[in-house]
Amino acid sequence: MGTRLLCWAAICLLGADHTGAGVSQSLRHKVAKKGKDVALRYDPISGHNALYWYRQSLGQGLEFPIYFQGKDAADKSGLPRDRFSAQRSEGSISTLKFQRTQQGDLAVYLCASSS
C-alpha cells in the first residue's frame, strides 16, 4: 500500500428498536497519504445519547477506544493524544480526528449509538 493509509468508516448500530430514523456518515471510506490529517464524522440517530467509536486493525479483534455519554468523552484508547482526538457537540455529531497519519493507523473505524 506504500505511502497510502486506508481508513474505513463504517456504521454499526446498537439497539433492537426500529425507529425509522436515519443515520448519516460523512464518508463510506477514506484514503489518505501517510502524514496527512484525516477526520471521520458520524451523525447518530436523534435521541441517542450514548456514542461509541470502535477500531479494528488488520488481523486484530475489535477495540473500544472512545465512548461518549452526551458530549462528555471517556477515552480508553491509549491512542496518542497529540495525534488523535474525538469530539461530540451537544448530543449530536461526533468527529474522530487523526493528525499526521502513520502506517499503524490503518484500521476499520466504526461508530455506534444507542439511547
Swiss-Prot record:
Domain named Ig-like: residues: 22-115
Keywords, comma-separated and alphabetical: Adaptive immunity, Cell membrane, Immunity, Immunoglobulin domain, Membrane, Receptor, Signal, T cell receptor
GO terms, biological process: adaptive immune response; cell surface receptor signaling pathway
Localization: Cell membrane
Keyword Cell membrane: yes
Gene3D superfamilies: Immunoglobulins
Signal peptide: 1-21
Record Pfam families: V-set
GO cellular component terms, A-Z: plasma membrane; T cell receptor complex
SUPFAM superfamilies assigned to the protein according to its UniProt record, in alphabetical order: Immunoglobulin
Function, in words: Probable non-functional open reading frame (ORF) of V region of the variable domain of T cell receptor (TR) beta chain. Non-functional ORF generally cannot participate in the synthesis of a productive T cell receptor (TR) chain due to altered V-(D)-J or switch recombination and/or splicing site (at mRNA level) and/or conserved amino acid change (protein level). Alpha-beta T cell receptors are antigen specific receptors which are essential to the immune response and are present on the cell surface of T lymphocytes.
Subunit structure of this chain's protein: Most probably, the alpha-beta TR is not assembled due to incorrect folding of the beta chain. Alpha-beta TR is a heterodimer composed of an alpha and beta chain; disulfide-linked. The alpha-beta TR is associated with the transmembrane signaling CD3 coreceptor proteins to form the TR-CD3 (TcR or TCR). The assembly of alpha-beta TR heterodimers with CD3 occurs in the endoplasmic reticulum where a single alpha-beta TR heterodimer associates with one CD3D-CD3E heterodimer, one CD3G-CD3E heterodimer and one CD247 homodimer forming a stable octameric structure.
Protein name: Probable non-functional T cell receptor beta variable 7-1
Organism listed in the record: Homo sapiens
Gene that specifies this protein: TRBV7-1
